[in-house]
């Protein structure tokens, strides 16, 4: 199994993993896989929002001349 061929046949890959001793209790069922994916996406979104807030807080307030240019 290499980076190029690993997704060609997922069943073959799974069988090879089992054959070399992969623990079956580490295999996620569909509901656990979906829940894990959802948690990952929620964490990404939370980090994105935190980074946006951090960026906005670090921005200096425009001075009076800059406000005039904006208006």
Swiss-Prot record:
Composed of three domains: a modulating N-terminal domain, a DNA-binding domain and a C-terminal ligand-binding domain. Coiled coil: none annotated. A zinc finger (NR C4-type) spans 1-17. It comes from Eleutherodactylus coqui. Nuclear hormone receptor that can act as a repressor or activator of transcription. High affinity receptor for thyroid hormones, including triiodothyronine and thyroxine. InterPro entries: Nuclear_hormone_rcpt_NR1, ThyrH_rcpt, Znf_hrmn_rcpt, Znf_NHR/GATA. One of its GO terms (biological process) is negative regulation of transcription by RNA polymerase II. It is found in: Nucleus. Residues 48-71 are annotated as: Disordered. One of its GO terms (molecular function) is thyroid hormone binding. GO terms for cellular component: RNA polymerase II transcription regulator complex. Keywords: DNA-binding, Metal-binding, Nucleus, Receptor, Transcription, Transcription regulation, Zinc, Zinc-finger. Residues 1-22 bind DNA. Belongs to the nuclear hormone receptor family. NR1 subfamily. This is Thyroid hormone receptor alpha. The lineage of its organism: Eukaryota, Metazoa, Chordata, Craniata, Vertebrata. The gene is THRA.
């Amino acid at each position: 199994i290499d980076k190029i061929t690993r997704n060609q046949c997922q069943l073959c890959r799974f069988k090879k993993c089992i054959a070399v001793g992969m623990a079956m209790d580490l295999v996620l069922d569909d509901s656990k896989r979906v829940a894990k994916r959802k948690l990952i996406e929620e964490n990404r979104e939370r980090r994105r929002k935190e980074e946006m807030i951090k960026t906005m807080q670090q921005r200096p307030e425009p001075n009076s001349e800059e406000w005039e240019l904006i208006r």
